[in-house]
Amino acid sequence: MNINIVKEKIKLHKYYLITIIIMFIIIIVLGFFLLTKENNTFTNPYEVKVSPNDNFLFLGDSITDFYPLEEYYDNLPVVNSGIAGNRTIDILNDMQTRVYQYNPTKVFLLIGTNDLDSSTEDIVDTTFDNIKEIVKEIKDNRSDATIYVESVYPVNSNVENNSVNNRTNKKIRSFNKKVSNYCDGDNCIYINLFDDLTDEEGNLKEEYTEDGLHLNSLGYVVITRELLPYLNE
């Protein structure tokens, strides 16, 4: 065999070998880059999501859920974390999703009316205990957040096709009194909206509701007027 042909084959084999090695290195580097990128974009569901600006969280049940916050609080950083049908225990069981992930600077808590629909004798005390636990957990996990606890709103069983069920204003007033006393101990800021919504007989004003329980647009106007100073302070 011609010596030149042999040399040419050797050179060709070296070329192939070098090419394979280079491609192998490129594959390794590319794989490492993609793996690093994937790890960097992984989101830990329990990681604190820090908001660089103010973040005002409205936390509650259907009354909050149905509250069109962006419409009433234009250009304010409001977040709606209301879920229809919720009770205090539902919030306690889901604090990460309902509160912590938003890293709020202010929390407006309105919860308890669905608890008070129960006919259990100790329901007022049980609901109050859960309120205290919600406040405590927020303070422990978001110590810089200011916590506002709204009074549970009044109801009106005289409205046709009402949704009041076992709720009574007597029971609601008893609950609100406990919460008010608790917040006076610097645990939170109590906002009494009960009185702003009641008529002369102590019921939810009919012009503020369609079913005796939930607010209509006029009712939300009243609430917004009372809450706005707290958002702006």
Task: Put a short name on every predicted segment.
Residues 126-150, 168-188:
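Charged, glycine-enriched surface loops/patches
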Residues 110, 150-151:
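Alpha/beta-hydrolase-fold catalytic nucleophile elbow
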Residues 154-233:
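Catalytic His-Asp segment of secreted/periplasmic serine-dependent ester chemistry enzymes
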Residues 38-133, 170:
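Conserved SGNH/GDSL esterase-like catalytic core that processes O-acyl groups on lipids
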Residues 87, 115-117, 153-156, 197:
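Feature marks short, surface-exposed loop/turn motifs that line or immediately flank catalytic pockets
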Residues 1-59, 69, 232:
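N-terminal secretory targeting modules
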Residues 2, 9, 18, 79, ...:
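Extracellular glycan-modifying ectodomains
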Residues 96, 100, 112, 136-143, ...:
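Sec-exported extracytoplasmic/periplasmic mature domains
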